[in-house]
Amino acid sequence: MQFSKSNKLANVCYDIRGPVLKHAKRLEEEGHRILKLNIGNPAPFGFEAPDEILQDVIRNLPTAQGYSDSKGLFSARKAVMQYCQQKEIEGVTIEDIYLGNGVSELIVMSMQALLNNGDEVLIPAPDYPLWTAAVSLAGGKPVHYLCDEQADWFPDLDDIKAKITPNTKALVIINPNNPTGAVYSKELLLGMLELARQHNLVVFSDEIYDKILYDEAVHISTASLAPDLLCLTFNGLSKSYRVAGFRSGWLIISGPKHHAQSYIEGIDMLANMRLCANVPAQHAIQTALGGYQSINDLVLPPGRLLEQRNRTYELLNEIPGVSCVKPMGALYAFPRIDPKVCPILNDEKFALDLLLSEKLLIVQGTAFNWPWPDHFRVVTLPRVDDLEAAIGRIGNFLRTYSQ
């Protein structure tokens, strides 16, 4: 008897860790050294967590052996509540905050609690693909609105408006954006929120990169601009505090919660079912948010992340036929390959061919639900020497590549 995967997974996809990565693992098993530009995982690139965070987690391990409240430790949630005040998000109490095993778990929970079969959710293209996967897994229909590369990758408000239907339940905003690195202006956010207001949409705001900003870019929390809208804000420690392996994130519910009691009860139920988030990592939150913000040393001159972002941008734009909008935040670049110079029909095949030829791992643009096979994503985490070697390999490969 054959056992097949559930039909619920028919439209679920997460190609950041997809078939190309499987080939990379096989090559590593054969003894090849793979230069990895595929995942925003700071620690393997030498970005260590602040010592005080690690020390506090170690110090609290003896008291972290049991379950916590399903929403999380009071002290950690209070620290998040105080962070809401810094970000000017109004009306948030301790009970409006949920701690999770990373933002990923909370995204899936929030979609499972909200969506019925056929409900539509507006998601940016390109996006962080977990958003699309979570909507599909919950029985919803992801509808992708275009971000405009010619306008610094800002979302196209007209495209969002055109894609709203009677079935649309929610609008997803990823700011700073993964994979493009765009940081949205106040005017843009207000325009997006006005569409949500007109059509009574729930707003999901992914703000995991809110402290990773370059060139004096300013992050504005979506919920701070819309106290009248139900807004779910997602953030965590993985990127800004370099502890992705801790799986420590949070969800903040703001706005008219009295209109969403049934939905919130659904989130509560799912939070209870998974018992609680990883308790040792919850002890990192108060120290991280209340301590010295060492991320600023990395993103302000002469910080390492800033230097690597700059070099990545310069090197990509030096490759004939490749152009890249300068990322203003996050840990990625999302360059375009001019189809007139190097026509690519299948960008997953391009990523695999690059891996096999150059032992270099990137992620194809369609993995981020970009509709055309003309982009790819690289992380800006490697040291400058490795970035120069990697992007040099991409340039050499494209010189002779054809499909």
Question: Which residues does each predicted region cover?
Answer:
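PLP-dependent enzyme catalytic core of the Aspartate aminotransferase-like
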Residues: 86, 161-162, 343-349, 353-362, ...
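Helix C-cap/helix->beta junction micro-motif
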Residues: 27-30, 138, 198-199, 229, ...
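Conserved core segment of the aminotransferase class I/II
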Residues: 227-303, 313-314, 398
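Conserved PLP-anchoring active-site segment centered on the Schiff-base-forming lysine
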Residues: 113-135
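N-terminal small-domain helix-loop-helix segment of the aminotransferase-like
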Residues: 2-102, 109, 276, 288-291, ...
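Conserved glycine-rich beta-strand-loop-beta hairpin in the small C-terminal domain of fold type I
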Residues: 286, 303-313, 324-338, 372
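A short helix-loop-beta submotif of the ANL/AMP-binding
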Residues: 137-143
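Active-site phosphate-binding strand-loop segment of PLP-dependent enzymes
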Residues: 143, 148-219
